[in-house]
Amino acid sequence: MLLSAQGCAPASSAAEGGGTHGLTISDARAAYDSYLQASNAAAAQGNQVQGLALAADAQWAVLHAQYTALASEGTPVPQYKYGTPIFYVPALAGYPQWFMVATTRTPITAAGAATRTIMAFERSAAGQPWTLNGTAALNQALPAIATDRDGYAVAVSRSDPGLLLPPDVVGASQAGVVDEGPTNPSAAVIASGPLTTGLYAAQSAQSSSDTAHGWYYQWLLEGSPFEQFGLRTTDGGALVLYGMYLNTTTEHPGLVRGSPIPVPASFTPLLAAPTEVGYHAVYANWTFQYAAIDPPASAKNAKIQVIAGGGGPSYGHAY
């Protein structure tokens, strides 16, 4: 069944799968098709109520900011054209139900190339609508997913002891490297890459640039309360999806009043009032969805690889 419709099981905060297929691939495909139609229609119409009703967790935070930018500056909410989907459907009997889709996504409303994207959908309870909880652009191929005899995948719990790290601390370990770089102890288990040491380098460069202006720059990648999902891989590891916040501050030392600190352009529409000026500080916070490969504990010299990321600005403030 590993064709254009592929079965899989979740590793969110819900328990591991018990082998019952309460959600079929046909159900997932119908929910996915409905989402594509409704989300693009809401974006085209600028219908914030309808658009946000289709999202949750990291996706809601990013989408809320996009609709805020539409209202404040007329910036169109992104619309996309999607390629052929591959479905990963959980084998859980109860709720929450969820599934993942791997596909290509090309912007319609702005220039941009197609990106290979993984999307996580969830229905929290019977009678509740399906929501898109997060999207992440892949920077390498997805790992092979282990499946049962019916083609459905094996769920991975948040505390699985058979992995290099329990899935619920993968995000915190990534954050250690992003916040402090390769000298952080987490670098022993987190591989270098654009979403780990690369993000640290980018933030460090921003800090150096701000220091040259006489400002003090701080950043912190931290965990979120968002649902976490995971799939067993064929080598005994796991593919883990999770959400994170990246909070940044640029301030005059001691928060004394000084010359205005510029607000990043992508955050200007998110200010509560256009009169906000960074005489003291500017806060620019992001919300991200990540996907990582967590190798089996038995793998020698293995490290966790963060293979996908996506998100955007979610909060801005200046005073």
Language model region names:
Residues M1-T103, A111, T115:
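An N-terminus-focused feature that recognizes amino-terminal "leader" regions
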Residues A56, A126, Y245:
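Residue-level marker of positions within ordered structural domains that often coincide
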Residues I108-L164, T233-L241, S266, E276-Y319:
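Short beta-strand edge/turn micro-motifs at domain boundaries
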Residues G254-V282:
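Mixed-charge, low-complexity intrinsically disordered segments
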